[in-house]
Design a protein with these regions (language model features):
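Eukaryotic low-complexity, non-globular regulatory regions
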Residues: 1-4
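Short amphipathic alpha-helix that is part of the acyltransferase structural core
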Residues: 9-86, 91
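A broad, low-specificity signal for short, low-complexity segments enriched in glycine/proline
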Residues: 26-32, 42-46, 78-83, 112-115, ...
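Short secondary-structure junctions and interdomain/linker hinges
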Residues: 40, 44-47, 217, 241, ...
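Residue-level signal for alpha-helical context at structural boundaries
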Residues: 51-52, 158, 170, 228, ...
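Acyl-donor binding region in acyl/amide transferases
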Residues: 87-216, 221-234, 240-241
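Long, contiguous binding/interaction regions
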Residues: 240-242, 246-249
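Short, cationic low-complexity segments
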Residues: 252-268
Length: 268
């Protein structure tokens, strides 16, 4: 799958790289994703990673996940990635990654069905103009459509460099507009200390994308000290996917893409 990157008028003199989204099929593909994750999480954001000496971000769950990659078509460089853990593979792993941060017992009836967890989402700085995350959502939407996924969930991370001011503001907004029903809320295993909310909400792009799709914030955030972030648990009932985004990412994209480009996701 390929899509042109759209630049502002002042950037039109620059070549416009094309992007494609695909599932990793080789160990080298997965390694490229782990290298990008290291560059973003450790070098850019200062996360403390157990695998940092190897120059990658790798953990136990990687071996059980599908890895979705966004590549430049000219250089084949991986510029975006996320990983997908399906319910059957979570059973093989012994748990979902989110269970290391949240008590998910209220969600177990939903997660016994066809659910996916996404995580470790990152985009190269040069592609944070919407193109990189857009391609990831395109791939995720097609994966969900082809595998008949009912629920998608994962964590959206908020930096704690400000002592929790921004996450406090975001949660105040979420409690008013996006909070999941009580029966679908999770409990954090490590609570945040109270913080004075920031004067202005600065919604991270990933969280903003989740909420535009119609996702819920499913409870209070969890502190992740290794990454120095607060993780907000997000739950999306795919059957309630925002109609406009479903039409754009799923119906429209599947109709326009050649069969050869769609088959890679279907085979996962």
């Amino acid at each position: 799958m390929t899509a042109a990157i759209h630049h502002d008028a002042q950037d039109l003199r620059k070549p416009l790289p094309l992007l494609r989204v695909e599932l990793a099929t080789t160990p080298e593909d997965v390694y490229a994703s782990q290298r990008l994750r290291y560059e973003i999480f450790a070098k850019e954001q200062g996360a403390h990673l157990e695998s940092a000496r190897e120059g990658i971000d790798r953990d136990y769950y990687d071996d059980y996940c599908h890895h979705l990659l966004v590549r430049r078509t000219d250089t084949h460089e991986v510029v975006g990635s996320t990983r997908i853990l399906t319910t059957p593979n979570a059973r093989r792993a012994g748990s979902f990654y989110s269970e290391t941060e949240f008590d998910l017992h209220k969600l177990f009836p939903q997660l016994r069905g066809n659910a996916i967890e996404i995580g470790r989402t990152c985009i190269h700085p040069d592609f944070r103009n919407g193109a990189g995350i857009g391609m990831l959502w395109l791939g995720l939407a097609q994966f969900m459509e082809m595998h008949k996924v009912d629920y998608m969930f994962g964590c959206a991370s908020i930096s704690m460099n400000d002592g929790g001011a921004q996450v406090s503001a975001i949660m105040n907004d979420a409690r008013l507009n996006n909070l999941a029903p009580e029966t679908l809320r999770v409990k954090p295993l490590m609570h945040l200390l109270p913080a004075q909310p920031a004067a202005k909400v600065a919604m991270p792009p990933l969280l903003k994308a989740y909420l535009k799709l119609g996702a819920w914030v499913a409870g209070e955030p969890c502190l992740d000290p290794d990454f120095n972030v607060a993780d907000i648990f997000i739950l999306l009932d795919v059957n309630n996917l925002n109609t406009r985004y479903h039409r754009h990412f799923v119906q429209g994209s599947l109709q326009k893409r050649p069969a050869s480009e769609v088959s890679l996701l279907r085979a996962a």
